[in-house]
Amino acid sequence: DQVFLLEYIKDLLKMPEGVFEAKIWGETGFPGLRLDFNFGLRLDIPEGNFRVKISDFDSGMVFFDKHISGGRLLSVDQYFIRWQVEVFLDDEKIFSHVLNLEGQPVNIMFRIPTFGDVMAFLPYLREFKKIHRCKLSVCFKNNVGELVSQLYPEIPQIDEVNFDTYATYYPIMLMSDFPFALVDIRHLPMNRVGGLVLGIDYIPTKAVFKPTEPPVTDEPYVCISVQASINRKCWLYPGGWDIVVDYLKNLGYRVFCIDREAEQVGDGFTIRKPEGAEDFTGNHPLIERANMLYHAEFFIGLSSGLSWIADTVDCPVVMICGFSQDWFEFYTPYRVANRLV
């Protein structure tokens, strides 16, 4: 039923308490009729012989066109739509509004747990602010804040969202067809998902990373990452990483393993740092990882967040990508996959 669906959505998106019940501050000039876009579209309707029509201004698609007396309308769509709202009382139009973000306070709240997915979104934030000329703020619920501040200092960060803004977006990535997500993310490259969610049909230019620390050594080095969010993404060829590390060292490179953990257990597998790699594992700030990758000769990793950071700082990425399709993440000419295993 409706209550179950709303609670399911709130839990899935890790949304703040009160998002469904919070006061709608947007006045319409008609008593009791209030509108904002802090959870898709939110509209309070007073008692009376009202008819509400909600549509997509750009396509003309009608989402809702019914008579209603009292209550609150919520849309589940968590992506950019140029909403058009028309309200009639006794068949006379009393209110009409088309979503317009220009000059308005707008929040984007990231509840995505994996920082690689967040990194894929980042270039679209600046572009979204530029296109709509809105007062954009971003809320992150993971450890990317310091790195984002370095890359996009013009975008303020906030600790929590409130509901007195004009609009709030909750980007999500799902491997399924739910109405509040525009697409199953397996159907397009990750570096296009942010554009689809925020209504941008091109890939923006990445921010230019400026290192905040010098190289950890004057010798040439390569960074590697043998772990991912799940061990099924990892390279499971027996002794494969040891072969790679030995080869790189014979070429004169130092090899730094920069995973969070020296050992990761899951999915029936144990993934360990290669013995020949120098141990730079640990829960280090992402800005520190970004600096290390910026100064590295190149990076060898998986379909994981560290690959996204490497790409963000223009460190060449050699991606062992058998878990995902060749087009799924970002473009790199250095992809290694054996589709027979």
What positions do the PLM features span?
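Catalytic machinery of carbohydrate-active enzymes
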Residues: 1-341
